Curated annotation (Swiss-Prot):
Record field: compositional bias (Basic and acidic residues): 1-15
Gene: US420
Species: Gallid herpesvirus 2 (strain GA) (GaHV-2)
Name of this protein: Uncharacterized 15.5 kDa protein
Domain of life: Viruses
UniProt-listed Pfam families: US22
InterPro entries to which the protein is assigned, alphabetical: US22-like (IPR003360)
Amino acid sequence: MQRQTGHMEDKKRTGLESQGTENAFSDGRDGKDGLLHEGINEPILIPSTIADLEGIRELVRKFRGRLLPFEKCPDFCLRIGGLEASFHKGQEELLEYCEALYLPQPVKMEIVGIVDDVPCLATGMQLLILVAEGGRGICL
C-alpha cells in the first residue's frame, strides 16, 4: 500500500495537479490521479468531456504501445492497444461477442489495452480492458 506522501509526490512529479484535464484512466478519487508511467514525459490526458467511443479509439491509436502502471497494483501495467496487440489477434469477432453478450443489453465497446502476465485462466494470462458506451470499464 502506498503512503499518502508518496501519492502526493507522484502528483507533483507528473504535474497533474495543475492541469485542467483528467487522466484518461482515472481511479475516481479526485479525478486527477490514476495511471502514469515514469518513462512518459507527458501524461496521457484527455478533457473530461470526451466519453464517446470514437474519442477513445483515437486515444488508443495515438498512444498505442505505451505502458501505464496501475496506481493501486503497480506490479501490473496497462499496455495501450487494440485486439491486434493481444493473443486474440485476428479474432475480430471477439469484440462483437463482447458487445452482444457481456452486459445485460448489447452495447458498443472499444478495446483500450491489455494487462499482461496476470495469474489467471485467461488466454495467455492476458486481460483485455474495454470501455463501453457511457464510459463503463470492463475487464475480459
